[in-house]
Swiss-Prot record:
It comes from the Eukaryota. Orphan nuclear receptor. This is Nuclear hormone receptor family member nhr-35. Residues 448-464 have a biased composition (Polar residues). The gene is nhr-35. It comes from Caenorhabditis elegans.
């Protein structure tokens, strides 16, 4: 055969494409290693065969290969464009994509794409969307029928050894798959319980409003463009704040971790938390408002620039000079980040359980720290599962909301203190105990018995003492039912108008099932908080 080949003919890779093993043997025995007539060098037979098999490995000589049709470089992976290591399962691929395809087929994994199966797969983000990566493996030529069954002898031996250890160890153990599910469920139940606590307070508030019967509800649409006709007065603001302080105590008593603490430690947490609670709640309630702060009683504190001329003087001299800071530093971030209900209740509970609150006992510090860690872990898990694309959301919520909260709440406490010392308004004992705890005045009162301080009232009016935190914490809350009437009985719901506007008011403690008020005309109970939220409870939140 070699004697009949023209001396000027030279084999090229295109000629070698059709060679098989038999032809390679013929070439090996037929070709001469010396050039005929000394004109053209003859191809080395061993190099020809080596080149042939190398082409088979890289797909150069495969007529079905995509490398010839689409011009792809066989040195890069056709899936992620990383450095290819050869043909794996029918496609030019790297070791990473080869292993990914093998694991997916062997373990019957099912993936789903969140972006309409249009993810771009490259070596930098190939692990972002497994569905699109697997589909690209298939479109690049990988075949699942070429994946052999798993033959991991070492892995089987390790599994047998682990089984022997498990059988010999008297301590029961569970696999990670079994232990993760209860933890995930516990986190979900924790957030649900926090929402239930909000529902408990809402149910209590609705019950009292129904029994009172004279609370003023707004007659205008919730989507009204103007709310200047609902501008709050100083008396309205203090009434709303007083009611919110009463309800936050009842909210705290619905939390199991809070009830494990002693009465003294509970009072410490509430004094540290009350001002931040008022600020955080009014900010979250104002997310749906139009450049204003919305109070519990459905009234508004507008910006100074939004007020009418006859209200300008009132706003300029208003004690809440930091209202606009709350709008800018809390309301706007909440609106921008679209803070939802579960995130809000989780952040609120984290603020309550502050392990560095001054005055906590050593035993309470560990309990409070564990409670905060547990709630924050549930918060992180919720964000990770429900908002996976916002990888920095936990940090954004923490820094943009919780960071300015403490500073703003202390500023508001100082504003309230200013109204007291300037004689603009009288502040009741409950506010002094909770809101003014962070001010110099509150620190001077630490050695005084809470309810021994009677508020001055005008002549002719009756002296009275607002319920202090210690008294409210001692009330009975034996049942955890959201609609339990004992909650209504335990809460001394009243608004001390004498402490705010100089008008004497009498009240009686509501009794179980039939709460009664001696003078309900002076009662200004809070409306449902978070009116722009909690859509999952349409019958409760208005």
């Amino acid at each position: 055969m070699g004697n009949k080949i023209h001396a000027g003919f030279t084999f090229t890779p295109s000629h070698a494409r059709s060679l098989d093993c038999f032809v390679c043997l013929l070439v090996l025995f037929s070709f001469r290693s010396t050039p005929p007539h000394g004109r053209h060098p003859a191809i080395e037979p061993t190099l020809l065969i080596s080149h042939y098999y190398r082409g088979q490995m890289l797909g150069t000589y495969n007529g079905d290969s995509k490398a010839e049709t689409d011009g792809k470089d066989n040195s890069i992976c056709h899936i992620c464009s990383d450095v290819a290591t050869g043909r794996h399962y029918g496609a030019i691929a790297c070791n990473g994509c080869k292993g990914f395809f093998r694991r997916t087929v062997r373990r019957n994994y099912e993936y789903h794409c969140r972006f309409e199966s249009k993810c771009e797969i490259d070596k930098h983000n190939r692990a972002v969307c497994r569905y699109c990566r697997f589909m690209k493996c298939i479109s690049s030529g990988m075949r699942d029928d070429q994946v052999q069954s798993e033959r991991d002898v070492i892995g089987k031996r390790e599994k047998k050894d682990n089984m022997k250890t498990y059988c010999q160890d008297p301590t029961p153990r569970t696999s990670p798959e079994l232990t993760m599910s209860p933890v995930e469920d516990e986190y979900d139940q924790l957030l649900e319980s926090l929402l239930k606590s909000e529902m408990t307070i809402q149910s209590l508030r609705d019950t009292v409003i129904t029994q009172t019967g004279n609370v003023e509800y707004t007659t205008k649409s919730k989507n009204r463009l103007s709310h200047t006709d609902r501008t709050a007065t100083l008396n309205d603001v203090l009434k709303s704040m007083h009611s919110q302080l009463l309800l936050v105590i009842e909210w705290a008593k619905t939390l199991p971790e809070f009830k494990q603490l002693s009465g003294a430690d509970q009072a410490v947490l509430l004094k540290n938390f009350a001002g931040q609670h008022v600020t955080l709640c009014v900010a979250y309630r104002s997310v749906g408002a139009n450049d204003a702060l919305k109070l519990l009683n459905d009234l508004y504190i507008p910006r100074a620039s939004k007020t009418t001329p006859h209200l300008k003087e009132y706003v300029d001299g208003f004690y809440l000079r930091d209202c606009e800071k709350v709008m800018d530093q809390l309301v706007e971030p909440m609106r921008f980040l679209k803070l939802d209900n579960k995130e809000f209740v989780a952040l609120k509970a984290c603020v309550l359980f502050n392990p560095v609150a001054p005055g906590l006992s050593n035993h309470a510090v560990n309990l409070v720290l564990n409670a905060r860690r547990k709630i924050f872990a549930a918060f992180e898990k919720y964000v990770r599962v429900n908002k996976p694309l916002e990888t920095t959301r936990v940090g954004d919520l923490t820094f943009f909301i919780l960071t300015p909260l403490s500073v703003l709440s202390k500023s508001i406490s100082e504003d309230i203190m200013f109204t007291k010392v300037s004689g603009v308004a009288r502040i009741d004992v409950l506010m002094e105990e909770l809101i003014l705890a962070e001010t110099d005045y509150g620190e001077d009162r630490q050695d005084q018995t809470p309810c021994s301080i009677m508020n001055d009232t005008p002549s002719g009016s009756q002296d009275m003492c607002s319920p202090c935190p210690e008294d409210l914490l001692r009330t009975s809350t034996s049942s955890n039912s959201p609609t339990n009437s004992s909650l209504t009985a335990g809460l001394l719901l009243k608004t001390d108008d004498a402490m705010m506007s100089g008008i004497g008011t009498q009240y009686t403690t509501p009794q179980p099932h039939t709460p009664q008020f001696a003078d309900s005309s002076h009662l200004n109970l809070p409306y449902a908080p978070f009116t722009s939220s909690y859509n999952q409870y349409p019958n409760t939140y208005s």
